[in-house]
From Swiss-Prot:
Family assignment from sequence similarity: Belongs to the WTF family.
Keyword entries, A-Z: Meiosis, Membrane, Transmembrane, Transmembrane helix
Membrane-spanning parts: 107-127, 145-165, 180-200, 217-237
An example Gene Ontology biological process: meiotic cell cycle
Disruption phenotype: Normal vegetative cell population growth. Simultaneous knockout of wtf15, wtf14 and wtf7 results in normal spore viability.
PROSITE patterns in alphabetical order: ER_TARGET
Protein name in UniProt: Wtf element wtf11
Principal subcellular localisation of the protein: membrane
Places the protein is found: Membrane
Organism field: Schizosaccharomyces pombe (strain 972 / ATCC 24843) (Fission yeast)
Primary gene name: wtf11
Membrane topology reported for the UniProt record: Multi-pass membrane protein
InterPro entries attached to this UniProt entry: WTF
Length: 264
């Protein structure tokens, strides 16, 4: 009768047998001269022993903690219900607010609009000159040159900042239409302002003669037209910005100036 006998061997006996056959030291024996093997410190790797088998036995999977920490960090930084994979990268964002003139509008169209506004500006100045019976021959060379340079500067500004001023005009017109109830009061204040300006200019002409009036007529017409437009816009957008107190102060200043001129 044959019996299958299997000897009972422990894991320690198997390791000792493998050492004796292969001549490999698994690092389980303690060297009395060197002492105990250094303990592996995960925070400071200076204590890592040279034997890789010992480090494997102390910390079987050193990447386990790193993966867990990385997963926890990503989970904490990711908001609930938000998928970062669908969000576009920040580097793709382009800031178009710094653009002054975009290529969406043809350059020829921008030039035509700008030159039309410059022509209107020149026609207003020419009309003021004709109103005061001043022809182009009466202007000096420097006056003509300054007029030409001012027209070129206006053309350059209108073309360079086309997107800016067109958007501002559109928003302003929309806002004025929303405030259409304030337009009658704005027209009334503009009318009062021009009446006061007329009497002021008439008083200055009477005090200093026609020569003073002819010299300042162009400036007076342009300045009063510009100020009238600004007063209308301010009063339409914000009623009371050019209030009665402001007009009263101007009247007091004009009366005080006329009294001083009469004394002289």
């Amino acid at each position: 009768m044959n019996s299958n006998y299997v000897p009972l061997t422990s894991s320690v006996d198997v390791e000792e047998k493998m050492e004796s056959e292969n001549g490999v030291d698994l690092g389980n024996d303690i060297d009395l001269e060197k002492g105990l093997p250094l303990k592996y410190n995960s925070e400071n790797e200076s204590g890592l022993p040279s034997n890789s088998a010992s480090s494997y036995l102390i910390n079987p999977d050193p990447t386990m903690d790193l993966e867990a920490q990385t997963f926890n960090h990503n989970e904490s930084t990711t908001s609930v219900g938000h998928d970062n994979s669908n969000s576009p990268p920040k580097c793709r964002k382009t800031c178009s607010s710094n653009k002054v003139y975009s290529n969406e509008v043809p350059l020829l169209f921008v030039f035509v609009i700008s030159i039309s506004i410059v022509c209107i500006f020149d026609l207003v100045i020419f009309g003021c000159l004709q109103y005061n019976m001043v022809s182009m021959d009466d202007l000096h060379v420097m006056q003509r040159l300054s007029w030409f340079c001012a027209s070129l500067a206006l053309l350059f500004i209108l073309m360079r900042y086309y997107d800016f001023w067109t958007k501002a005009c559109k928003d302003g017109i929309k806002h004025i239409f929303k405030k259409w109830k304030n337009t009658p009061l704005a027209f009334l204040q503009v009318l009062i302002f021009n009446i006061i300006g007329f009497f002021v200019r008439k008083g200055l002409k009477d005090s200093f003669g026609e020569q003073w009036g002819l010299k300042t007529s162009l400036f007076a017409h342009v300045s009063f037209a510009t100020m009238s437009i600004f007063i209308f816009i301010f009063e339409t957008l914000k009623p009371g910005s050019c209030s009665v107190d402001w007009i009263a102060r101007i009247l007091k200043a004009v009366v005080y100036f006329l009294e001083d001129s009469d004394e002289l």
